[in-house]
C-alpha cells in the first residue's frame, strides 16, 4: 500500500516514510489515534486506496482527516476515486478534513462531494538541527508568567 500510494499520488506524493506513518497511525489502538484504510480492487489487483486518520478532536478540528486517496488511472474504472471518498465519508464518524494543493484537479471532485474551502493552510517548519537541540523537558515547560 505504501508503494501504491507513493507511485499513484504522483507529484502530490509524500515520501514513503511519511506514508507508512500515516498507515501506522490509522491502525493504532492508542487513545486518540486510529482510522482506517479503504482498498479498491479490480479482481485481485489493487487499483485505488484511501487512508483516514482520526484526529481525536472535534468541533474546531474535524474528527477525521482524509490523508490520502489515490487511484491507478490506467487500471481503475472511472469514478473509483470518487467512490473511495464517498465510502470514506460514510465510514467516518464526524466531520472530515483534507488538504489539497491549489492546482490539483481533485479540488473539483471534493467540491462536488460537499467539501468547502475553509482555510488556507500555512506551515512553519522548525529547522531539524533546532529540533535535535531542544530537550523534551524544555519543550514541556509552561510559558513565562504561567509558572
Please tell me what each predicted stretch does.
Residues 82, 97, 102-124:
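Conserved active-site alpha-helix within GNAT-family acetyltransferase domains
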Residues 75, 79-87:
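Conserved acetyl-CoA pyrophosphate-binding loop and the N-cap/start of the following alpha-helix
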Amino acid at each position: 500500500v505504501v508503494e501504491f500510494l507513493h507511485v499513484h499520488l504522483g507529484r502530490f506524493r509524500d515520501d514513503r516514510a511519511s506514508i507508512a506513518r500515516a498507515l501506522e497511525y490509522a491502525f493504532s489502538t492508542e487513545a486518540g489515534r486510529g482510522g482506517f484504510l479503504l482498498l479498491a480492487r479490480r479482481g485481485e489487483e489493487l487499483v485505488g486506496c484511501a487512508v483516514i486518520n482520526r484526529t481525536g478532536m472535534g468541533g474546531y478540528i474535524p474528527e477525521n482527516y482524509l490523508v490520502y486517496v489515490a487511484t491507478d488511472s490506467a487500471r481503475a474504472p472511472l469514478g473509483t476515486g470518487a467512490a473511495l471518498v464517498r465510502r470514506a465519508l460514510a465510514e467516518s464518524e464526524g466531520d472530515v478534513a483534507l488538504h489539497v494543493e491549489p492546482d490539483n484537479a481533485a479540488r473539483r471532485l471534493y467540491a462536488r462531494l460537499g467539501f468547502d474551502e475553509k482555510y488556507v493552510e500555512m506551515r512553519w517548519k522548525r529547522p531539524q538541527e533546532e529540533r535535535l537541540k531542544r530537550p523534551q523537558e524544555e519543550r514541556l515547560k509552561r510559558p513565562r508568567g504561567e509558572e
